[in-house]
Amino acid sequence: MTANTPKRLLALDILRGITIAGMILVNNPGSWGHVYTPLEHAAFNGLTPTDLVFPFFMFIMGISTYISLRKYNFTYSHATLRKIVKRTVVIFCIGLFLNLLAKSVFTHHLNFEELRYLGVMQRLAIGYGVTSLVAITVKHKYFPAIILVTLAVYFLLLAMGDGFNLSATNIVARFDVWALGTSHMYHDGGMAFDPEGLLSTLPAVCHVMVGFYCGKLLFSAKDNDEKIQRLFLVGTILTFAGFLLSYGCPINKKVWSPTFVITTCGLASSFLALLIWIIDIKGYQGWCVFFRSFGVNPLFIYVFAEIMGILLGATGASVFIYEKVLVTVLGNYPGSLAYALLYVLFCWSIVHILYKKGIYVKI
């Protein structure tokens, strides 16, 4: 016996599509040396628009996880466990494949010796897997307490372990070096410091858990008006708390600080409420087609964009298009942005064909 599937919210697809389009945009400039400031990540402490796209997607993944597990009444069974483990492993392995491809195409051999173990897809996999397992084994009313305790413990680790300085003594870097080894980590300015490392995945899981709990609030509401009221309330409280606490705990994406989790979850909740009001209540949907095409096939198009980006870079095609065409016409910075926008349009043309044909690639 399964529960009724909740009515699909178009706003959720659109927010998912906006974040995926944003991830593709910021990951594929024509030149990393010519990127406008809002499209760059904060150097360390701080928050830019670019810093929002990944945590927004993790928040949305939490809501999607709620919808998915609701069909099974959130009950533990071998079938549900197999589904969770299978999806977790598949997403994680796709991330490993992307890292191996990126390393191998430039060294011209299968480079396992310097294979980066973690990354965006791996973080998504762990966030989904842990949240799903907790959701089918623990009462959902305990989610806020689990999130708060996790973030509090992580803050203590950062505070006592030089966690708010970008240095080799940072506890996040030290733990990851110990657990993964420097040859299997991302290197930031020559230093082994992985922004999707193992220790910082602990608070990142909280992003998915907050999204999951917001999914519970969403689909237990009696109508769309109550949905946006709940989301705006949660969003306002979290955003205010995040910025207030940032005076003692800096907002920092690289270490995924507790205030980064709280603030970005608050902003994501508020933005989703705004989209529900615009799209699902007011019915202003004419502009949605572009982002919906991304939103219904999110992981597929993200993986496609990563693979194509690697191949374009390895063959020199991206450099040729940027330097010989776009820079000549537009200049360095506008040309770099134009390349990223054209790449987003290229990816959209692929995923829009799938959308029009009703093809949804599930990972």
Regions from the PLM with identified roles:
Residues M1-I363:
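Alpha-helical transmembrane segments and their immediate juxtamembrane cytosolic regions
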